[in-house]
Regions:
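A short glycine-rich, His/Asp/Glu-containing loop-to-beta-strand
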Residues: 65-95
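Conserved short histidine dyad/triad with adjacent acidic residue
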Residues: 89-103, 153-155
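Short beta-strand His + acidic residue motifs that chelate non-heme Fe in jelly-roll/DSBH
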Residues: 100-101, 119-120, 152, 158-163
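Glycine- and acidic-residue-biased ligand/ion/polar-headgroup-sensing regions
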Residues: 105-123
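A short hydrophobic beta-strand segment most commonly corresponding to one strand
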Residues: 109-111, 165-181
Length: 210
């Protein structure tokens, strides 16, 4: 790799880090001023949409999905590794990626750089008294794509479904790092069982980029 190429790569990495830190600073200010509310998450989502326009800083070549024959359907990149509190990830998903309905145990905001992801949003219809079982029903569907974000409070429930032929590249910003979310719940629609989502369904590996 030539000196000029090395300098260009270093420059992009520095610009990316600065853009990430600016986003996180803005998100902290929004939460400090508005609290954890849907209004605050809408403002954070708008800020994430702006970050997603800086495509040269988040090129899919630098954040590739898994190989199609690997057996995996997602790669998660942590953009502010080692930091406590807010955690920004870039998720690269292959077509065919799905999840069971789950909550997050913290707030979340999601915005797309590339690709479309169907989000099915659910509501609980039981009284919540049984810690092992729940009844949920589909309330809404939202296709997250460039220009169309989505956000969730900690108890909101959704599932994701990636169709089509092309991978996705989406920002996911959380109030706390995913690996710390021990109260995150998954909901098995066929049995009604509630499961610990991180323990049973979350891909543990995260690549640090920062």
């Amino acid at each position: 790799m030539s000196t000029t190429t090395n300098e260009a790569v270093t420059d992009v990495a520095a610009q990316r880090k600065a853009a990430v830190q600016a986003l996180l600073a803005d998100a902290r200010t929004i939460i400090d001023e508005k609290g954890v509310t849907r209004e605050a998450l809408a403002a954070i989502s708008a800020r994430l949409l702006e970050l997603a326009t800086h495509r040269a800083l988040f090129d899919s070549a630098d954040f590739p999905p898994p190989q199609r024959d690997s057996g995996d359907t997602s790669t998660r990149y942590r953009l502010n590794p080692g930091e406590d509190g807010f955690a920004l990830y870039l998720n690269s998903l292959l077509p065919g990626k799905t999840t069971i309905p789950h909550n997050h145990d913290t707030w979340a905001a999601i915005a797309a750089i590339d690709g479309a992801e169907l989000n099915r949003i659910y509501r609980r219809t039981d009284d919540g008294r049984d810690p092992e079982r729940a009844k949920i029903e589909l309330a809404q569907e939202v296709v997250v794509r460039p220009g169309v974000p989505i956000a969730f409070l900690s108890d909101d429930i959704h599932s994701i479904h990636v169709g089509g032929a092309e991978p996705t590249l989406h920002f996911h910003l959380y109030g706390r790092p995913l690996e710390t979310l021990t109260g995150r719940l998954g909901f098995e629609t066929d049995t009604g069982l509630i499961v610990r989502y991180n323990a049973t369904h979350m891909q543990r590996a995260t690549q640090a980029v920062g």
